[in-house]
A protein has these predicted regions:
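Membrane-interface "cap" regions at the ends of multi-pass membrane proteins
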Residues: 1-51, 55-60, 74-79, 90-91, ...
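Helix-loop-helix connectors at the membrane interface of multi-pass transporters/channels
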Residues: 2-3, 7-12, 17, 95-107, ...
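Helix-loop-helix junctions that connect adjacent transmembrane segments
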Residues: 19-24, 60, 64, 141-147, ...
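Hydrophobic transmembrane alpha-helices that form the core helical bundles
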Residues: 52-55, 75-153, 157-161, 166, ...
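Transmembrane helix-loop boundary segments of multi-pass membrane transporters
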Residues: 54-59, 129-145, 165-174, 294, ...
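TM-loop-TM module centered on a large, flexible mid-protein loop between adjacent transmembrane helices
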Residues: 96-97, 103, 135-140, 246-311, ...
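C-terminal membrane-solvent junction of multi-pass transporters and transport-like membrane proteins
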Residues: 170, 331-338, 381-430
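A generic transmembrane alpha-helix motif of multi-pass inner-membrane proteins
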Residues: 372-377, 389, 406-459
Length: 459
């Protein structure tokens, strides 16, 4: 009875949006979604994590194997999300899948965590990286550093408020500049001979392990699942979503392999392992300080693209939550003229700026944001993978235009990867995980204080 009521409510909610015309409209193309996937994934990690991965592998074959494995694992995850997103196109993305599979309470806890910790924390993380690299070009004091992190978040939020086309065009432009810049680095590292010989060998990393290397690889690949939040606004979603995910992950894997080939060619694995800024060191070796400044500008553009994509998709989850829970109903309003979830965008921008302010008091804002967000993110990513199994059993009658090949082995492997990453992230961040867990607990308390979610609208 409960399952039927849930399904009926889900259908009636979607019908209500169509009847009133107040809701997402199909305005996002295949190209837009691919640009968003590439933009959100290729943020700042590729400029930092290769040195950590080199230190933890210690051998060229293992180093490149780790990056190839990251691409394969991401492709496996993309296949799972392709089935979910084409069977259940919805602006809530993971929230919608978790609600249908595990009930509204789990759905609420996910969207609460994503709204308050996961997405704004990631945006703040990127903003701190942007400010760090801007400070290598312009001298910034402490207050100016905070403003350098906060202003891009506020500006991109305002840009997205102007309309969905403004947001997607900005994303396409930033992603295009980013990809051109990355290939310039690849050409510099592979074609132009280094100006000096690679650095001397260094002792192996004391805690080196292939498993820890994979943690950093998968962190660098993270974000391709954001495409699911655009399924309600995408043209021909049942056909284009699969293509967007596969093309997006394929492009990202190719770019990462080529970038790391350039790093290895220009610096050697040993010097990579001891570098604090591997891309800057490579370009400085080839082009001097001008090359290092070029990398700083490229990282700033890359961070801007990832921030814009995160604001764009994060607001869609907030909108879905506002549609389904009366306490957040102010988030569930869609602005017809701009075709945007205006209140949800404003809320996402405000919470992100709050995390920027909070992180500015921490010793290292970027590290603090990783600690606050990583364990909660991997916990719900695991549940999203499990929802594929649950929904195949609970709702076999739902049309699935795309089915994961080699079921159940591929989704099982994806879930086991999430388990490993959850365990590793908890071990890596230590006490910082309690901040994210405290916010999750606050959501649970809020859920208990309000009326039963079975009386609310669905997710």
């Amino acid at each position: 009875m409960e399952k039927n009521r849930n399904r009926s409510s889900l259908q009636s909610d979607g019908q209500r949006v169509r009847d009133t015309g107040a809701g997402p409209k199909r305005a996002i193309s295949l190209k837009d979604v691919i640009a968003l996937i590439v933009g959100v994934v290729i943020g700042t990690g590729i400029f930092k994590t290769p040195s950590m991965i080199a230190a933890n592998t210690g051998r060229e074959d293992l180093f490149f194997l780790a990056w190839l494995a990251g691409g394969i694992i991401s492709l496996i995850g993309a296949l799972c999300y392709a089935e979910l997103a084409t069977a259940y196109p919805h602006s809530g993305g993971d929230y919608h899948y978790l609600t249908r599979a595990f009930g509204r309470r789990i759905g609420f806890l996910f969207v609460w965590s994503r709204m308050t910790v996961i997405q704004p924390g990631s945006i703040a993380m990127l903003a701190f990286v942007l400010a760090d690299y801007l400070s290598t070009i312009l001298p910034l004091g402490r207050s100016a550093h905070f403003l350098a992190a906060a202003i891009p978040v506020a500006f991109l939020t305002a840009l997205n408020l102007m309309g969905v086309q403004k947001g997607t065009r900005a994303q396409n432009l930033l992603t295009g500049i980013k990809v051109v810049g990355l290939f310039a680095v690849v050409l510099a590292g592979v074609i132009i001979p280094p100006s000096s010989s690679p650095g001397a060998p260094v002792p192996p990393h004391p805690g080196a392990s292939f498993g820890l290397a994979m943690v950093f690889v998968l962190l660098t690949f993270g974000g391709w699942n954001e495409a699911a939040y655009l399924s309600a606004e995408m043209y021909e979603v049942r056909r284009n979503m699969v293509r967007a995910l596969l093309w997006g992950v394929g492009i990202i894997t190719a770019v990462y392999l080529l970038m790391n080939l350039a790093y290895w060619r220009g610096l050697g694995l040993e010097e990579m392992g001891q570098s604090e800024a591997v891309a800057a060191d490579l370009m400085r070796r080839i082009l001097g300080e001008g090359g290092a400044r070029f990398i700083s500008l490229l990282i700033i553009v890359s961070a801007l693209g990832a921030i814009n994509a995160s604001i764009f998709t994060g607001a869609r989850t907030n909108y879905a939550m506002g549609r389904d829970f009366s306490i957040f109903s102010f988030l569930g309003k869609w602005q017809e003229r701009s075709n945007t979830p205006m209140n949800a965008l404003l809320f996402m921008g405000a919470i992100s700026l709050m995390w920027v302010l909070l992180g500015s008091f921490a010793r290292k804002g970027f590290v603090a944001m990783v600690e606050y967000t990583a364990p909660v993110f991997w916990c719900f990513f695991l549940l999203a993978g499990l929802s594929l199994f649950v929904l195949r059993i609970k709702e076999p009658e739902v049309s699935r235009p795309f089915l994961v090949p080699l079921y159940p082995f591929i989704p099982f492997f994806f879930c086991m990867t999430c388990v490993y990453m959850l365990r590793s992230s908890v071990a890596y961040v230590g006490g910082g995980a309690f901040v994210g867990l405290a916010v999750l607990a606050a959501g649970a308390v809020l859920l208990l204080l309000k009326r039963s979610p079975s009386q609310e609208g669905p997710g």
